[in-house]
Amino acid sequence: EPYRRQRQMCIRDRYIGQCYLFLRQVENNPGETLLQEWLPGEKEQWLAEAHFLIAYYHFALLRKYGPIPVITEYVPQSTPSSEFGGRCHYDYCVNWIAYQLDLAAQNLPPTREGTEWGRATSTMAKALKARVLMYAASPLWNGQFPFSSWKNKVNTPGDKDFFVGDDAKYKESIGRDDYGIELVSSSYNEKKWERAMEACQKALDFALNEGGCRLYGTEASDMTLYQTELGNNDKWLPYVPGKEDNNIQENREFKERVMMLRYMVASRYPHNKELIWGLTGKNINSRIQGRIPAHIFQTGNKTSWAGGF
């Protein structure tokens, strides 16, 4: 298990490095070896996608390990560990990630379709920013961290420059000129909740409008999608003890709601408009393995536990 955790961290660090390598190649390349000709806005969108992923991978590490080193440029593999400054203050990490997502959202489309589905959008960037800020406002990272003696060996710089646009009003109430060697704030700041709530509302409004999203089940087509596919009969309705008679309106509505909840997590794109960032890279085997109790399932040669179990 310790090896598995270390491997996950290394993978995300590697992805961050690959993103920065991509940015360097794009910025330093006129386009001949990448594309014969840039389409209007294409280069800016590629750069924005890379910044979105950099922010996302930093958040994935932050969520798992707390304060982390913030990587702002490509780091060669030969770099000695002595040149790394260590972890940054948790709030600094949060504000830097939020800033990166704001920048990325400026050059990302609100939606994707067809073969581009799953690539970064401004809707995803705003939703991810809202989640990052919600974590930062929660009690663990907002005044109730149990290990007050946990300190860094080097100072974390200030982050007021990260508060731009609508976040500029929180520059003085949340941002700092210098964090010193502190890694987690020991004092409660109500402004963090205010900022998080505002980000959530903006993300929701943007998703409902520019993003074309809506809650699943709010339109009649959600209730009848698979009824149409399976035929206009009652065979698509589930069996529910005590509610066998489909001619009773209450029974029918209950069964339709049961089916709606089933298809909410199984509907194929683009039927479920509630999806903001769909994940299509997982197969059924990985989901099954993820539900198997620890030390039950071994690899084929029986030398290790599959999936880390």
What feature does the model see in each segment?
Residues 1-11:
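Single conserved hydrophobic/aromatic residue that forms the stacking wall/gate
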Residues 8, 80-88, 116, 181-188:
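Second-shell loop/turn segments in exported
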Residues 1, 35, 62, 114-118, ...:
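Short, surface-exposed helix-loop/turn micro-motifs enriched in polar/charged residues
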Residues 21, 74-77, 112, 134, ...:
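Short, flexible loop/turn elements at secondary-structure junctions
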Residues 31-36, 110-118, 143, 208-219:
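Surface-exposed patches in mature extracellular/periplasmic domains of secreted proteins
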Residues 5, 68, 123, 135-309:
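An aromatic- and glycine-enriched ligand-binding surface/loop that stacks and positions planar moieties
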Residues 35-39, 73-80:
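Short linear capping/connector segments at secondary-structure termini
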Residues 12-31, 40-70, 90-108, 117-143, ...:
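Extended, hydrophobic/aromatic-rich amphipathic alpha-helical segments that build helical scaffolds
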